Each structure stands twice: as structure tokens, then as C-alpha cells.
């Protein structure tokens, strides 16, 4: 990386997407959320900050409301921020200072290499959980907490069976049913994700997993997407009937069994929610911290809008 820090704002139409995606691919902290094709599907609008000749990049995902431009975190996009080599506090601070002033409100997450104490900005920390699958399955299974092992055996005894590579719409339906947010906005997000899934599936970067009960009903499901030696566990859904029979435990175990021994991290995408954090850690997963930032430069008479 050049010793000189020259960060420029690049509007979407002028981004060199080949150089952009190459930067994400080669970055030590590269994540699938940073690729242009991921952002194209999940962000309402996005522009960019670029260091020199795409040595480091930062997507600016934004929207407009009440005439105000604001930065936000897109649906199913857990971490963004600055991607590139040798990211330190000085560089991260410079990127944040380079965000155009027209973005008066910020509320977004950075990534696990962006956790620094900064001179000009306050970052807060969020928890993710990751599990290294580069071990024999028997070793991984022994590291599960006893209650996880017990629920997996229970699901097996009750006739639950894992399935994979089925219609992603079934995953979305179960997830939305669980979230109880079947709104116009959630439907739009779901439609965008279906398009993204088809794109990733064509690249062999996505697959659906599920658990059928003894009546062959789908009681747990999710999507796994792959990039940078990570498998991201997203859009998890759990039918009420599945919660009492260990369906979600069995689903995650099925994926681990299929991928044990590979150079792969299982990325649980969170969570700061205590019960979920305990659940993920019960599989032997460890904490990986990442950063978030909120900034409100709205006029005093508008600050209530984004509270």
C-alpha cells in the first residue's frame, strides 16, 4: 500500500467493478458482503470511497428519507466498512472523515478488521461467533455443549432428517413466518435476496439446508453462502414444532458433519442477543468482534426522525 493516503469519493456509475471485486477478493478481511454483486442486490443505493488505485475500499450504502441522505446497513448484510490490506486506526479514521457531508445520519456496521480506537469517531463493538471446521467431525462434536448433543440425538430419535439444495422460497417463507414481519418492505427484501441467491447459486456459492420432521414437514431451514473460506449462516427459520425437537441443533450439526475437516469457518453472523450468543457458542464457536458506528448530524428539529 502506498504511504500516501488519498481517498476519493466515487459515485456508483464510475466505480471500476473489476478492481473493486479484486480488492475484496484479495483483502485479508474480505467478506462476501463487500462484493459489487452482493451490494447491487441488497443495497437500495451505494457509492464508494476508494484508496489510491483500489488498494482499500469502503462501500457507502445509502437511502433517502424526508429529503435526507443517510447511511444504513442493508438487509442480510452483516458487516461492511473498510476492506483492504494493512488497515489501521489512521486509515480507518481517514476513510470515515472522507464520507461526504451530505450524509447527515450514519447507522451501519464495519467489519472485524475495523475494531480500533479512533481520534475523531466513536465506534462500538458487536459480537459475532465463528467456528473453525478444520477438524475431524468427532472432535468438533465433542466440543458441543451437552445440551446440544442431547438435542441432536433427540431430533434423530424423533425421525428428523436433513435435506439440502431445495427451493430457497421455502427458507424465506419459514424465516418470515418466524419474524412475523410480512410487510411490503420485507417482501421487497425477500425478492432481492432470491435474485442474489440465484446469482450465488450459479457461482456455487450458496446452498439451502433444512430439517424435515417425521411427517416430512420443514421445521428448520437456512441458507449457507460461501466466500473467503467462510460459510455464512443466514436467514435461519425455525417452525414452532421444530423448537421442541432439536431441529435447529440438528440442522447446524448436519452442515458441520458435511464440512468437517475443510479449511472453512462457520460464520454464525452474530449475535449480541444473549440467548443466540449462548446457542452459537454451545457448538464450540468463539467470539469475533466487529465494529459499528452511529452519527447524527441532523438539524436539531429533525433529530427525532432517526431515533
Could you say what each language-model-derived stretch is?
Residues 1-14, 18, 288, 300-307:
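Short, Lys/Arg-enriched, disordered terminal segments
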Residues 4-53, 58-67, 111-243:
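A conserved beta-strand-loop-helix scaffold within acyl/acetyltransferase catalytic domains
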Residues 44-46, 101-105, 206, 261-263:
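Short, high-confidence coil segments that cap the C-terminus of an alpha-helix
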Residues 49-50, 104-110, 266-268:
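Short, hydrophobic beta-strand segments that form beta-sheet elements in well-ordered domains
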Residues 64-79:
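Conserved acyl-donor/pantetheine-binding loop and adjacent beta-alpha core of acyl/acetyltransferases
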Residues 78-86:
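The substrate-binding groove and active-site-proximal loops of carbohydrate-active enzymes
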Residues 89-127:
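Non-catalytic accessory segments adjacent to catalytic cores
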Residues 90-97, 199-304:
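Aromatic (often tryptophan-rich) hydrophobic motifs at membrane interfaces
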Amino acid at each position: 500500500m502506498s504511504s500516501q493516503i488519498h481517498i476519493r469519493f466515487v459515485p456508483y456509475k464510475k466505480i471500476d467493478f473489476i478492481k473493486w471485486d479484486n480488492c475484496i477478493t484479495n483483502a485479508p478481511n474480505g467478506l462476501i458482503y463487500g462484493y459489487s454483486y452482493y451490494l447491487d442486490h441488497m443495497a437500495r443505493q451505494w457509492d464508494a470511497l476508494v484508496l489510491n488505485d483500489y488498494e482499500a475500499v469502503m462501500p457507502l450504502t445509502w437511502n433517502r428519507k424526508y429529503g435526507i441522505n443517510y447511511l444504513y446497513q442493508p438487509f442480510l448484510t452483516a458487516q461492511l466498512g473498510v476492506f483492504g490490506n494493512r488497515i489501521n486506526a489512521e486509515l480507518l479514521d481517514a476513510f470515515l472523515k472522507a464520507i461526504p457531508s451530505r450524509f447527515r445520519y450514519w447507522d451501519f456496521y464495519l467489519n472485524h478488521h475495523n475494531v480500533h480506537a479512533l481520534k475523531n469517531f466513536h465506534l462500538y463493538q458487536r459480537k459475532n461467533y465463528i467456528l473453525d471446521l478444520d477438524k475431524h467431525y468427532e472432535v468438533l462434536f465433542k466440543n458441543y455443549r451437552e445440551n446440544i448433543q442431547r438435542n441432536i440425538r433427540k431430533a434423530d430419535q424423533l425421525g428428523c432428517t436433513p435435506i439440502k439444495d431445495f427451493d430457497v422460497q421455502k427458507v424465506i417463507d419459514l424465516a418470515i413466518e418466524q419474524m412475523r414481519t410480512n410487510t411490503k418492505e420485507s417482501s421487497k427484501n425477500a425478492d432481492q435476496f432470491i435474485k442474489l441467491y440465484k446469482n450465488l447459486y450459479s457461482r456455487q456459492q450458496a446452498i439451502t439446508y433444512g430439517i424435515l420432521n417425521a411427517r416430512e414437514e420443514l421445521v428448520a431451514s437456512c441458507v449457507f453462502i460461501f466466500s473467503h473460506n467462510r460459510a455464512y449462516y443466514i436467514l435461519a427459520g425455525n417452525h414452532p414444532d421444530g423448537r421442541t425437537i432439536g431441529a435447529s441443533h440438528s440442522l447446524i450439526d448436519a452442515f458441520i458433519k458435511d464440512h468437517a475437516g475443510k479449511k472453512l469457518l462457520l460464520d454464525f453472523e452474530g449475535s449480541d442477543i444473549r440467548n443466540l450468543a449462548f446457542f452459537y457458542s454451545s457448538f464450540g464457536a468463539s467470539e469475533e468482534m466487529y465494529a459499528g458506528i452511529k452519527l447524527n448530524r441532523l438539524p436539531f428539529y429533525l433529530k427525532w426522525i432517526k431515533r
